[in-house]
Amino acid sequence: MASSSSSSRWSYDVFLSFRGEDTRKTFTSHLYEVLNDKGIKTFQDDKRLEYGATIPGELCKAIEESQFAIVVFSENYATSRWCLNELVKIMECKTRFKQTVIPIFYDVDPSHVRNQKESFAKAFEEHETKYKDDVEGIQRWRIALNEAANLKGSCDNRDKTDADCIRQIVDQISSKLCKISLSYLQNIVGIDTHLEKIESLLEIGINGVRIMGIWGMGGVGKTTIARAIFDTLLGRMDSSYQFDGACFLKDIKENKRGMHSLQNALLSELLREKANYNNEEDGKHQMASRLRSKKVLIVLDDIDNKDHYLEYLAGDLDWFGNGSRIIITTRDKHLIEKNDIIYEVTALPDHESIQLFKQHAFGKEVPNENFEKLSLEVVNYAKGLPLALKVWGSLLHNLRLTEWKSAIEHMKNNSYSGIIDKLKISYDGLEPKQQEMFLDIACFLRGEEKDYILQILESCHIGAEYGLRILIDKSLVFISEYNQVQMHDLIQDMGKYIVNFQKDPGERSRLWLAKEVEEVMSNNTGTMAMEAIWVSSYSSTLRFSNQAVKNMKRLRVFNMGRSSTHYAIDYLPNNLRCFVCTNYPWESFPSTFELKMLVHLQLRHNSLRHLWTETKHLPSLRRIDLSWSKRLTRTPDFTGMPNLEYVNLYQCSNLEEVHHSLGCCSKVIGLYLNDCKSLKRFPCVNVESLEYLGLRSCDSLEKLPEIYGRMKPEIQIHMQGSGIRELPSSIFQYKTHVTKLLLWNMKNLVALPSSICRLKSLVSLSVSGCSKLESLPEEIGDLDNLRVFDASDTLILRPPSSIIRLNKLIILMFRGFKDGVHFEFPPVAEGLHSLEYLNLSYCNLIDGGLPEEIGSLSSLKKLDLSRNNFEHLPSSIAQLGALQSLDLKDCQRLTQLPELPPELNELHVDCHMALKFIHYLVTKRKKLHRVKLDDAHNDTMYNLFAYTMFQNISSMRHDISASDSLSLTVFTGQPYPEKIPSWFHHQGWDSSVSVNLPENWYIPDKFLGFAVCYSRSLIDTTAHLIPVCDDKMSRMTQKLALSECDTESSNYSEWDIHFFFVPFAGLWDTSKANGKTPNDYGIIRLSFSGEEKMYGLRLLYKEGPEVNALLQMRENSNEPTEHSTGIRRTQYNNRTSFYELING
């Protein structure tokens, strides 16, 4: 159950309390992983040191904000004052905040915890000796232990496996969270009826893909209903309701970021990995190919036909896996007429309308009978529309009886047509300035970011922030998850209706339709009433008229959109606050304009060579946006702009210099000069207010001047790809303020100043691609908080020895060609304790280039040593206990694999190396589940690999047992052709395969099991051994949980081939045989979890005379068996000896 559905009082679902030295790397890490996989937001203090007695404030805050606390009592739990104080805090929060505490007794007796016996008694003896002056504190510990050990719902792992214990705890929490997260449904009026009908229509337990359309007018509650059914289906515990992925895509028609952004959001949510496709066609292809095997639940909310959303988001049923359900909400019935189901949402019946209105007007109880009667009058006017009931209820909330009567009388005396007119009462209840703000948002600012809107509104209206809060409180606008100011369509329609009440466009206060603006401009009908013109669409016929604009003395906001005007703009009203014009055709902006009120100037994609030549006094100006000004060579003088906050010069490709007066602008927050390819001179800047400085890809900028002023903690400086040769030391004068420094692809950078090592808060540092950088500062080890360091593609040959002091470093990369010289990594003993990923590929490493004690990197999970020249590897690699992935591809001189770490599950080597050591890989490294072979590009190589791998199984000296169910995935380096290695005799493509077995196929002590191969994604597979005759004989069944072989199984793809072995010892159950022999069973069936696969299968024997005789047999009949009806079968043709080399 997703934690987002939990009560807003909690920041976390679960807080984990544990003794690090006992369970951090075992039980607790597994529990944390399962909780996260279930979508349960869990706080685990990964970096806890457990020194001292006082727990940090942020840890106390996390405990207070967690809905559940899991306490893992282990043998040494009581030895830690940290843990005991943490427990005291947890039990306090249980009392204060009604949190749920779940104790787990990990290899300890609950009575030992409850009564402090055994190891707990010993720990308290030491505490009482050492802290004898803190009697009260010790007593608090004892009480907390006693209370925790007496709690219900505990788990004792002594009578169950770790997996069972974890499953019990996670199921317990999931169930409670599900009930809590769905509790909000109790407050949605009439929702039960909708849920019952929709769930029945969706027929969740039925196979196939279904698309349902929820249709109705705006404001009738379609989104609310869709969200409720979405949460309800996800909250069901029944297995038929389990989906592989789910996504609620809200307010689709308001999307302004392109179709591909919606596709990326949908794919990211469903696949649980970041999707970043740049156009809708790529996104469409990926959705069709990657979701077809996934059972998904999708809601596409508020679809219209403007941008053909359905075509690109749910174009075909074949896009989605069996059992998928797609729900669409829309006002346009014709968009969903071809779907399986259309569910119409109509107005609420009277009794539900009254209930909903009272919920918003009164909260709980109606004050008296007079309000009851007035409520019925309001409900009657609403005509059952939920939006109107909510808005009017909020409007009348906390008003006196006389005010109620006045508002209702106002409704009666104004015969508005339709609900839009009725919603106007909300507008009429606003102050005049708040009304003006509302109309600005409704007519042209809806969907813009909150900060941007406030800046425009504040330039026009006093108290804009307070006014926006009033609009939110009155349910007229709301802030979206993207921090955009949004409103319901009907509310927006109501605002536009108010403005359009006057018939003549020239007499209106606001215009937003291009054709109406064109009419006013061409007929010179502008008047003093005009306050704002905002054209967001392109118009090829819109022409600017100076005469028409001269009549608009009160014009505050003027956005001409993307017009093709070639008429000179000679006049703009002095009252203007915001001017926007895309494709501005002239080389300069008129110097005669006196725009002292101007706040926002945006002239993108213009023909400007310069904005103006003289100094302009613009005291109100906060934003200048001249991005994509391809002909602009210099900026204006900024001296007269003391309040300037944002300057956007992005992709001004001919801009050569920024005026030095920019350094006088102390309020600047953002400077955007990325991709200014010709920029050569940049002034000193004041960084007191600066939050972003973008100089990325400024190729010609070789020098960055000193900066002055105190940096803000959140400042971001992007210089990657620039031509800067050296960095000014003033950037690093404030030691705690920079957390990320990206310097990659700075081709001229020759050195880093030693002052960079003062950045004590630096978390991420990249000098990747700085091809002239030869060394690092000797004090690099002083960067105590550094977690990511990328020095790929540089000339660095030996990092400073101090680098091993970076004990918080997680990722370290020196990847890159060293041009004939050899890279050498310093000794690492007693250092780099947190390092998880080390990339030394392409480093021209030779023997001795790696430290012999590399095995001391205890946290290392991924090591990339590909394309190097060493002949041997340090033997201590075997001591890398956490290592999961090792890359040795294209190491041409490597002749011997070292002993591999025990936890390794992915190995990337060349094919010849894999074949040479396949016996070792198969028999000695059972946790190895994936081998990556970039150079295995033909069927012969795959056949050889399969033959060699399974030959090693047959050559095992011990008997094959159920535990020998080998699973190994081969990454091929290219999408695998539609072909399975021919060594597998039985081949096909289906979600299930049945193979008829020959007579006497089973030879005691000779038959080993079934060798199986299939392509594409790794899924669980079930093997069935089926009797020849239906003589009430039981099937033999074995489920192979292959998807659990690797925690990163989601990485498996069409580039992979999966080999696995079904041992006969694991399939055959003598207790079910009832005296029958294996030869009484004549069919082997494999089921691939409902997903179609390209498969191959082969029976596997030890060599011997009986086997040779069997292999000469042929099946006498090709008739299908009664057991395989409706399932694709592959007939048993001939079978060569396992030891015979590959056919073909």
UniProtKB/Swiss-Prot annotation:
Changing residue 223 to A/N: Loss of resistance. The keyword Nucleus does not apply. Changing residue 619 to S: Loss of resistance. Keywords: ATP-binding, Cytoplasm, Hydrolase, Hypersensitive response, Leucine-rich repeat, NAD, Nucleotide-binding, Plant defense, Repeat. Residues 10-177 form the TIR domain. One of its GO terms (cellular component) is cytoplasm. Changing residue 142 to K/S: Partial loss of resistance. The active site is at residue 86. The keyword Cytoplasm applies. ATP binds at residues 216-223. It holds the Pfam family WHD_ROQ1. It catalyses: NAD(+) + H2O = ADP-D-ribose + nicotinamide + H(+). Changing residue 325 to Y/G: Loss of resistance. GO terms for molecular function: ADP binding; ATP binding; NAD+ nucleosidase activity, cyclic ADP-ribose generating. Disease resistance protein. Resistance proteins guard the plant against pathogens that contain an appropriate avirulence protein via a direct or indirect interaction with this avirulence protein. That triggers a defense system including the hypersensitive response, which restricts the pathogen growth. The TIR domain mediates NAD(+) hydrolase (NADase) activity. Self-association of TIR domains is required for NADase activity. This is TMV resistance protein N.
